[in-house]
Regions:
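Long, hydrophobic N-terminal alpha-helical segment
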Residues: 8-15
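Terminal, regulation- and interaction-focused segments at domain boundaries
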Residues: 2-8
């Protein structure tokens, strides 16, 4: 885990979007791999947990484990501030997630992941900050975010 993750924009293939929307969100969590832009899908299968590594819409590897704690070290969804959610929703953005990332030193850092649908599914991440509000602010100020916001969905 690096100290800073620059904002990135990635467009997922249609197959991956279809795969995500077909899943039961209550039992799964998703994150976009930083370097490889790999999508990790964590699923509970019976009494076991399965992590699938999906790259460009294709399953490239999978692992199973008996304990959720073995996967918990990756990314854990947290509750998103309502004011930020309302802002994104009013501007035509479909979803905002704040993800708590746990590094090797077990310190909690935050970054914002925005999912926008405007002809394609776009995932954008902010820089890593010490608090959720700082992460949101850093994303709002980024050139990448402003470029997407200027092309928001009409409503």
């Amino acid at each position: 885990m690096t100290d800073k993750i620059n904002p990135i924009v990635d467009v997922l293939p249609f197959e991956a979007v279809e795969f995500l929307t077909s899943l039961n969100f209550s039992k799964r969590s998703y994150n976009l791999g930083y370097a490889t832009k790999r999508l990790d899908v964590t699923r509970k299968v019976g009494d076991r947990y399965k992590v699938e590594y999906v790259e460009r819409g294709e399953l490239v590897n999978s692992e199973e484990c008996n304990r959720w704690s073995d996967f918990k070290k990756c990314t854990v969804p947290t509750v998103c501030p309502q004011e930020a959610y309302r802002w994104f929703n009013s501007e035509g953005f479909l979803n905002l997630r704040i993800v708590e990332t746990i590094g090797n030193d077990c310190a909690s850092n935050y970054f914002v992941q925005v999912i926008v649908q405007n002809g394609a599914l776009i995932i954008m991440e902010s820089e890593v900050k010490n608090s959720a509000s700082e992460a949101i602010a850093s994303l709002f100020d980024s050139a990448e975010f402003k470029a997407v916001a200027s092309k928001r969905i009409p409503h």
